[in-house]
A protein has these predicted regions:
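C-terminal output helix
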Residues: 114-124
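Active-site beta3 strand of CheY-like receiver
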Residues: 52-58
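Receiver (REC) domain active-site loop signature in two-component systems and cognate sites
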Residues: 63
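Charged docking surfaces used in two-component/phosphorelay signaling
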Residues: 23-31
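Short hydrophobic/Thr-rich beta-strand motif most characteristic of the beta2 strand and flanking loop
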Residues: 33-40, 48
Length: 131
């Protein structure tokens, strides 16, 4: 199965307070055939997640009101979404940041600025496979 075929129709949520990051990720993902749900911060994401039920979630760490660690922890505590893969997005690449992300339940860590290939590879790693 080709990479594009594997990603076709996969619903991905991008949670980031930067419009530039949200739009860049959206362009890359839509070109690959994904459905994209955008959220400006953790509160916005929590309001949308139940309605849209994304297959993969990307979450920025440094956001106003509810940071990425808090957002991740709340998503992972919800029985319905605890198994949804969540990938932290951050310009910080320290060991402590990665460890803290794991402690709250993140499945992977992607450093910003990300490339189209690294973003799509992360989705492909966690995208549900068709039977």
């Amino acid at each position: 199965m080709t990479e594009a075929a594997k990603l076709s129709g996969v619903k991905v949520m991008i949670i980031d307070d930067s419009n530039t990051i949200r739009r860049s990720a959206e362009i890359f993902l839509v070109q690959a055939g994904c459905q994209v749900v955008l959220a400006e911060d953790g509160f916005d994401a929590l309001a949308k997640i139940a309605d849209h039920q994304p297959a993969v979630i990307f979450c920025d760490i440094m956001m106003p009101r509810l940071d990425g660690y808090q957002t991740c922890a709340l998503i992972k505590k919800n029985q319905r979404f605890r198994n949804t893969p969540l990938i932290m997005l951050s310009s910080k690449d320290g060991l402590f940041d990665r460890a803290r992300g794991r402690m709250v339940g993140s499945d992977q860590y992607l450093t910003k600025p990300f490339t189209k290939d690294s973003l799509l590879q992360a989705v492909a790693t966690f995208a549900p496979t068709s039977p």
